[in-house]
Regions:
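General marker for long, soluble alpha-helical cores
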Residues: 1-74, 78-554
Length: 554
């Protein structure tokens, strides 16, 4: 069982464990713990070879591959092929310099091990790496002089080679030398392949084979990975009681743990993972994280990006579990055991996507250009990719946004959207004036001076002010000289007249269920920015919640 955070035995205790127990400990260990256990273990090389290639790769990336040659020179050929698969491609192009970096580390091993590992790498991948760096000028059959032929057979397998540059000559000359000394027939076979292959077709073939190997690790093509974001209706989601089918290598391989350790779960998910998960669930979670990384086209070696996507994936899983099981960790664990992790991820994502769709509909409506500050922050956060929680909902003094941490935040956001949609209906269906576009307001000589500076609260309060001044309910600018008259009608002891507040809220509630919340929001603004200002100190340039025509423009 994988637990978070890991509790590991001392090295002596680790050596006394049987093989499955040792592998389970390694699965739970962080990078430095894993390195220490593997290096000190008597069967470290055997244990390392059993670990999933991605776990070994992430360990190397976290600690620095050039810092742990003693470990990487124990890695299996399958793991080495994975290092090149994970770290040496830019789209469908093999990166020459990144391949050099890994080959340089490989060549630090003992020569017999290097030769054996090179022979067991994916052959076409090895040919492509050499082809990028080495030109075979001629082979043994082209040498007429027997003395020259004999000399060349003693070095570089009898071939005349040109290298891309001096550094490449040192690296690939060393590679060919090792192969010639310990596997001469393979060396000749490799150079003949380099001599005969076309680079473009070979690279395409290697790229396709790489895709198959990545898929075995739960890493699909980026286009196919987009299905991880497919909509799943929360209202109709049901956890199936049927047995789950093992994913990818989970049926035969050692379960991974490195990717799961990079991020920290929260909420009920943290309780579930803290109690431990079995190998099948560890595979599912890793495959899910991998699919999200591929969908986002994240470099698998960019640990900060991987960690960020891990936090995001855990956050959405937590939303799904809270939606299905509340805070009951036992029920949540049952959901994780009976529903695929990807289904739960899609459920959590859909809970936030549903909020985003509502926010987008409001922003595309006529009111969208005039949202007041908190509501604009709300919709701005929801329109991010992925949808995010606006902190102004819980801390009015803050304006940040972050991932949704709990279902409570989803529910709070829904409540704010309910209020925002009520505002939309008030303006679109009930108020007796249309909302023009921001460029169609005639505000020359007014404060605010342009439609883009207006908010729904200012538009409503200006219309209400006109009504109190016995004019039609419409957002026509007030004359600066009318502010003192309005102040006397609205203010009582620095607060909004309680009778006016009650009447206004009752009227809005009669027009639209939930409309009174908008009225309360607007009157609170009036109370702070208008009522608390003494009449003698009213300055039309600084009065909030009203459209005022300045005296100088009259």
């Amino acid at each position: 069982m994988t637990t978070f955070p890991p509790k590991l035995p001392a090295p002596k205790e680790f050596s006394a464990l049987n093989r499955p127990e040792q592998l389970e400990v390694l699965r739970r260990a962080n990078a430095r713990q894993k390195l220490r256990l593997l290096v000190e273990a008597a069967a470290g090389e055997e244990l390392l070879a059993l670990l999933p290639p991605q776990d070994v790769y992430l360990l190397a990336r976290e600690l620095g591959p050039d810092q742990i040659p003693e470990l990487l020179t124990m890695a299996s050929p399958e793991q080495w092929t994975a290092f090149f698969d994970f770290d040496c491609w830019d789209g469908d192009t093999l990166g020459r310099l990144s391949a050099r970096k890994w080959l340089a580390i490989l060549l630090q091993g003992e020569a017999p091990w290097v030769a054996k590992t090179l022979q067991e790498l994916d052959f076409e991948l090895l040919v492509l790496m050499v082809l990028r760096e080495v030109q075979v000028v001629s082979g043994p059959e082209e040498m007429a002089d027997e003395d020259v032929m004999a000399e060349n057979r003693r070095r570089e397998c009898g071939y005349v080679l040109d290298y891309r540059d001096e550094d490449g000559a040192k690296l690939f000359g060393g590679l060919i030398d090792v192969l010639f000394r310990y596997a001469p027939e393979f060396c000749r076979y490799l150079l003949e392949a380099v001599r005969s292959e076309g680079e473009s077709l070979l690279e395409e073939s290697v790229y396709q084979q790489r895709g198959g190997r990545l898929l075995d690790q739960g890493l699909p093509e980026p286009y196919a990975a987009q299905t991880v974001y497919a909509w799943l209706d929360p209202e109709s989601f049901v956890v199936s009681g049927e047995s789950k089918r093992p994913l990818g290598a989970s049926a035969i391989g050692v379960a991974p743990g490195a990717a799961l350790q990079l991020a920290s779960p929260r909420g009920v998910l943290a309780e579930v993972l803290g109690a431990g998960v079995d190998g099948q669930t560890a595979w599912e979670l890793t495959c899910l994280l991998n699919k999200v990384m591929m969908a986002e086209k994240i470099d698998l070696g960019d640990l900060d990006a991987v960690r960020g996507l891990g936090e995001r994936s855990y956050a959405l899983l937590n939303l799904a579990l809270e939606y299905l099981a509340g805070s009951n960790a036992t029920a949540a664990a049952r959901c994780l055991q009976t529903a695929y992790a990807e289904q739960l991820f899609r459920l959590g994502h859909s809970l936030t996507l549903r909020l985003q769709r509502r926010a987008r509909a409001v922003r595309e409506a006529a009111v969208g250009a005039y949202l007041d500050g908190p509501y604009r922050q709300l919709t701005d956060a929801l329109l991010q990719r992925p949808p995010q929680f606006a902190e102004v909902l819980v801390r009015p003094e803050r304006g940040g946004r972050r991932l949704f941490a709990s279902l409570r935040e989803v529910r709070l956001t829904e409540e704010w959207l309910d209020r925002l949609e009520a505002q939309c209906r008030l303006f679109e269906e009930h108020f007796p004036f249309p909302l023009p576009s921001v460029d169609d307001w005639a505000l020359a000589g007014c404060h605010p001076g342009h439609g883009r500076e207006l908010t729904l609260s200012a538009i409503f309060l200006t219309a209400l002010a006109n009504r109190l001044l016995e004019r039609p309910f419409a957002p026509q600018p007030l004359a600066a000289g009318e502010l003192s008259v309005l102040h006397a009608l609205v203010s009582r002891g620095g607060n909004v007249n309680p009778e006016l507040r009650a009447q206004t809220l009752s009227w809005l509630a009669s027009l639209e269920p939930g409309g009174s919340a908008f009225g309360a929001f607007c009157l609170d603004l009036w109370e702070e920015e208008f009522c608390k200002v003494r009449t003698a100190e009213l300055d039309p340039r600084y009065v909030g919640g009203l459209i005022v025509r300045l005296a100088a423009a009259l």
